[in-house]
Regions:
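Alpha/propeptide regions of enzymes that mature by internal proteolysis
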Residues: 15, 29, 33-60, 66, ...
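Active-site glycine-rich loop that binds ribose-phosphate moieties when present
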Residues: 124-150, 158-162
């Protein structure tokens, strides 16, 4: 069955041709070019989706301050969700049961992944590790679970080889587009951006025509543990309701609702940021 409504969350670190933090940082000389590379990959997915019969495509700018995509560079058929903070779903803001499939573009591996481009989990400045029921979760994992809570499968992901490998394990049948091989945190061997867009366009069309994955719904209850970078951050995070501090840098929260997991993670991260002085 053709997916009529498509949700796209696009980050920046996993875009083809991107290897260094300077490229994704507002104010750097490299940033404007990276914005265009990001827009091109978003447009490739939009074009593929509409070519295969989609009727609505929503693109959520999911990097940093979430003001990276320039509206005039985006396919006019798409809707663009830009700006932040996006409360309560962040990178998945706008995703709900009205969508038939989700796509994650420009994504990166979870914090602590060896030889992965700019590995981190939501906030590299605050989060050392995020675990659910004892298993480390990256952005792709938790965002897929949030989509799954609405019955939305993730059909396509794109990024470096480490991220794609993590998603292959998490989401059986997902279409992965590896746009680069990470050699370290700041260097990679990338395919040409035009080739990346071609692969994304073709894959998006295939996924809209027929999605091979099921919604990701991890079994509740959820024991959520987050290790922050330092004890001062944990001092602030423990002010959040229903939080148990389990160590100098460690926090714990329990719930039966994956959407509460996302809200608590966001609250902890926001509180941790107040200790960045």
């Amino acid at each position: 069955m053709t997916a009529k409504n498509v949700f796209i969350s696009i980050d920046m670190e996993g875009i083809a041709g991107v290897s260094h933090g300077q490229q994704v940082a507002r104010g750097s000389d490299d940033y404007p070019a990276c914005r265009t590379l990001m827009a091109n990959e978003a447009n490739a997915a939009v074009e593929g989706a509409f070519a295969a019969g989609a009727e609505r495509v929503l693109v959520n700018d999911s990097h940093g301050d979430m003001r990276n995509l320039r509206p005039h560079e985006i396919d006019e058929r798409a809707e663009l969700l830009i700006g932040g903070p996006k409360v309560p779903q962040g990178m998945m803001q706008g995703c709900d049961g009205a969508f038939d499939v989700a796509m994650f573009l420009g994504y990166h591996a979870s914090a602590g992944t060896e030889a992965a481009i700019m590995d981190h989990t939501y906030s590299g400045a605050a989060i050392y590790d995020l675990r659910i029921n004892g298993e480390s979760y990256g952005e792709g994992d938790l965002n897929a679970a949030l989509a799954g809570s609405y019955g939305v499968p993730v059909g396509l992901v794109a990024g470096d080889d480490k991220f794609c490998g993590q998603m292959d394990k998490r989401l059986p049948g997902v279409r992965t587009i590896q746009v680069k091989e990470a050699l370290g945190r700041w260097n990679s061997i990338s395919i040409h951006p035009n080739r990346a867009c071609k692969l994304i366009r073709e894959a998006a069309a295939d996924v809209v025509a027929e999605c091979a994955t099921e919604p990701f719904r991890p079994e509740p209850p959820y024991v959520v543990e987050m290790d922050v970078i330092n004890a001062a951050m944990a001092d602030m995070c423990q002010l959040a309701g229903h939080t148990t501090r389990t160590g100098a840098r460690s926090l714990r929260y329990e719930t039966d609702d994956i959407r509460d997991v996302v809200r608590q993670k966001t609250l902890w991260t926001t509180l941790a940021a107040t200790a960045l002085r």
